[in-house]
From Swiss-Prot:
Organism whose genome encodes this protein: Streptococcus thermophilus
GO CC, one annotated term: phosphopyruvate hydratase complex
Keywords: Cytoplasm, Glycolysis, Lyase, Magnesium, Metal-binding, Plasmid, Secreted
Name the record gives this protein: Enolase
Entry EC number(s): 4.2.1.11
Reported function: Catalyzes the reversible conversion of 2-phosphoglycerate (2-PG) into phosphoenolpyruvate (PEP). It is essential for the degradation of carbohydrates via glycolysis.
Length: 422
């Protein structure tokens, strides 16, 4: 019996910030169901694919009933009766149906929900795990990066830099790495409390203490790593996501950073000094604005052989934009977010480009998440090497890490572990 798409149904659900988002069910003629929920970002690149929101008074304008209607109407009519096993064909059908460069007609949140759900339905129909359906048998568990201190637009902490992350550089297994991070996370909470600092958590589960500066945040991270005997930079390393678009003045072309107005050159010097003083810092994401390609390229030239420089807002998981970045030698790694581009097929294309160009890849969640663990399977299948999904708090974050634990258990003790640096 030929299996085809029988029904596609979308609904409006709520994400981890209490905002509406799209969830899609794809049902096949063999009775198989594939379900997927779409995440949403707070700090977004200007050239990301467009989330379709309703506007108006309902749900403060953030409703997604239009996107839901597009799934249940035009998209369903275009895809019903199609084989779920030709993902690229179906994704391109939706792209053509939308007819815009940024998916603003049907909505990237509508298209991505269907794209993800079809993949899951096809895997379920074949009775294999999603990561196997994506990636076959040659698989690798990614190195996780945990956001333990939140700043920027993700928390009311007063720190300009958005994320301070830790990663288990040395680990015997994914579970061993997770154990190390959990230990540090709880020790960090005690250290902050002992210093009289409050420990609320931000959107991504990290603590949001009033530490004042980036350097203070990095310095305090050394303490729980040291006290656990993990040696900063040896067993546990540190990374930051500046999300510098949030403090870049596009008109005046400078960065309003920690009470000062810095040029690109001055900000580069700041990062250089930070890396020299704190050698456990191995990765900087979006150190420069998406509108400051020259600054990003200068940092890559100066530091690209010594530290990972991740492009997020500057590339927005878009293969066309990323090709431009490769030509200009901007960054040496790329952050991968499914909803930035809006289909699974285009996301895979971007990852393939990165691999050919020698760029590292890091799969990422969004600040507005759901309990869908899709990116965990995706990171394993794509040999992404790295993943970040928030901290060790908030169930929508931890669920991705728990899914990676399950995958490790399924694959057995001999499964390969991605290693960075290395």
């Amino acid at each position: 019996m030929t299996v085809t798409i029988e029904n596609i149904h979308a609904r409006e659900i709520f994400d981890s910030r209490g905002n509406p988002t799209v969830e899609v069910d794809v049902r096949l003629t063999d009775g198989t169901l594939g379900r997927a929920a779409v995440p949403s970002g707070a700090s977004t690149g200007d050239r990301e694919a467009v989330e379709l929101r309703d506007g108006g008074a309902r749900l403060q304008g953030k409703g997604v009933s239009k996107a839901v209607a597009n799934v249940n109407g035009e998209i369903y009519e275009a895809l019903k009766g199609q084989s779920p096993f030709n993902q690229a064909k179906l994704d391109h059908l939706m792209i053509e149906l939308d007819g815009t460069e940024n998916k603003s007609c049907l909505g990237a949140n509508a298209i991505l929900g269907v794209s993800m759900a079809i993949f899951r339905a096809a895997a379920n129909s074949e009775k294999i795990p999603l990561y196997r359906y994506f990636g076959g048998v040659d698989l690798e568990l990614p190195q996780p990066f945990f956001n333990v201190i939140n700043g920027g637009v993700h928390a009311d902490s007063g720190i300009d830099v958005q994320e301070f992350l830790i990663t288990p550089v040395k680990r015997d297994s994914f579970r061993d790495g997770l154990k190390k991070i959990a230990n540090i996370y709880h020790t960090l909470k005690k250290i902050l409390s002992d210093k009289g600092l409050k420990t609320p958590v931000g959107d991504e589960g990290g603590f949001a203490p009033k530490l004042g500066t980036t350097e203070n945040a990095i310095a305090i991270l050394y303490q729980p790593i040291d006290s656990a005997g993990y040696f900063p930079g040896e067993k546990i390393a540190i990374a930051i996501d500046s999300s510098s678009i949030e403090f870049y003045d596009d008109k005046k072309k400078f960065y309003r950073f920690e009470g000062k107005n810095l040029t690109s050159k001055e900000l580069l010097t700041y990062y250089d000094n930070l890396v020299e003083k704190y050698p456990a810092l191995i990765s900087i994401e979006d150190g420069f604005s998406e509108h400051d390609w020259e600054g990003f390229a200068a940092q890559t030239k100066a530091r690209g052989q010594k530290i990972q420089l991740v492009g997020d807002d500057i590339f927005v998981t878009n293969p066309t934009i990323f090709k431009e970045g490769i030509k200009k030698n901007v960054a040496n790694a790329i952050l991968i977010k499914l909803n930035q581009i809006g289909t699974v097929t285009e996301t895979i294309e971007t990852i393939s480009l990165a691999r050919k160009a020698g760029y590292k890849t890091m799969i990422s969640h969004r600040s507005g998440e759901t309990v869908d663990s899709y990116i965990a399977d995706f990171s394993v299948a794509m040999h992404a090497g790295q993943i970040k999904s928030g901290s060790m708090a908030r169930s929508e974050r931890v669920e991705k890490y728990n899914q990676l634990l399950r995958i490790e258990e399924d694959l057995g003790k001999d499964v390969a572990l991605a290693q960075f640096p290395g």
